[in-house]
Amino acid sequence: MRFSALLVTLGLTGALATPTLVSREAPAVGVISDISAQTSALASAVSSYNGGDPSAVKSASEKLVSTINSGVDTVKSGPALSTADALALTSPVQDLTKQVEGVIDDLISKKDKFVAANAGGTVYEDLKAQYTAADSLAKAISAKVPESLSDIAAQLSAGITAAIQKGIDAYKDAASSTGTASSSAPATETATATETSTATGTVTETATSTPVIPTGTASGSASATPSTTATPTTGGSGSGSGSSTGTATASTSTNLLSTGAASKEHFSYSLGGAVVAAAIAVAL
């Protein structure tokens, strides 16, 4: 009985003396985990984008930047990282680097679709914001690790910023595409038409008869030369010129017996003379 009680007492004493293991994760590790989750959300949004409204991608990018900036504050306000803490960051940072590279490659492959939606400039600005946030986080973590590991920490984080810089370079030429369509298509059209026509006509009429019949001569000539030149240009200028010349000449010549009155008078005079001559001849 006493022996059993002693064992129980020893057991309780041993249990109380054994330290309880409490899981302690460095704040920086939790920060990387949160950033990784939000990077996955951005990757999903980019993967689903096939043109049109890019708001889902923009929203995911803004949340990622917000998460990174929040992580920067957490690391800065947290304790210094031990060697074990720094080494614990190696694998998560490497995994995050691969995620970021995948998102950037997907963004680059869909550049034409974002530009077509006039969102190239938006993606460009989002990438710059991601770069600034990631660089701030890298500096914050490097400042917390032991000095002997600061170079290693910088090299690990450099992979993330290098991937983002690749995206920035790819979208740099689309920086001006920010939701407004711009197109320029100069066109110049020139047409020249020249039409020249010349018409010349001469008409001559001649009529001749005995002296008691009127004689008339008529001649006429006409010449017309229209010229038209038109040069239309898309800019809105045009010129035209036209000219025409016409000449007509007519002349009529009539002898002294060209009228009916003169012919009648001459006829009467001749008839009267003949009658008188006949009367004299009969009288003789």
Curated annotation (Swiss-Prot):
InterPro entries: Cell_wall_mannoprotein_1. Residues 1-17 form the signal peptide. It is found in: Secreted, Cell wall. Residues 176-234 have a biased composition (Low complexity). Galactomannoprotein, glycosylated. One of its GO terms (molecular function) is lipid binding. This is Cell wall mannoprotein 1. It comes from Aspergillus fumigatus.
